[in-house]
Amino acid sequence: MGDIEKGKKIFVQKCSQCHTVEKGGKHKTGPNLHGIFGRKTGQAEGFSYTDANKNKGITWGEDTLMEYLENPKKYIPGTKMIFAGIKKKSERADLIAYLKDATSK
């Protein structure tokens, strides 16, 4: 399991421009991520997803996020997420630990 505090810093630096995590948070360029764990791709209510995201059909969890966050466009070809990915596995683990904590409160 990753480090939540390190993950929060990564989120602020690399994700917060497009995403929020708090319950009831607004969608930005990307969807609000609250409740992402256990949710299928393309299912955040009120956000307009590409068909690629809606049709991927996986459920978000630690393993799927680990793979997705390495290279989003490879994992879901056609996604509108323009983020290049996080190559370091330890940084992805930290970010996932933070997301698991922050999106469940």
From Swiss-Prot:
GO terms for molecular function: electron transfer activity; heme binding; metal ion binding. GO terms for cellular component: mitochondrial intermembrane space. Pfam families: Cytochrom_C. Electron carrier protein. The oxidized form of the cytochrome c heme group can accept an electron from the heme group of the cytochrome c1 subunit of cytochrome reductase. Cytochrome c then transfers this electron to the cytochrome oxidase complex, the final protein carrier in the mitochondrial electron-transport chain. Binds 1 heme c group covalently per subunit. This is Cytochrome c. Keywords: Acetylation, Electron transport, Heme, Iron, Metal-binding, Mitochondrion, Respiratory chain, Transport. Heme c binds at C15, C18, H19, M81. The keyword Endoplasmic reticulum does not apply. The modification N-acetylglycine is found at G2. Belongs to the cytochrome c family. It is found in: Mitochondrion intermembrane space. SUPFAM superfamilies: Cytochrome c. InterPro entries: Cyt_c-like_dom, Cyt_c-like_dom_sf, Cyt_c_1A/1B. It comes from Aptenodytes patagonicus.
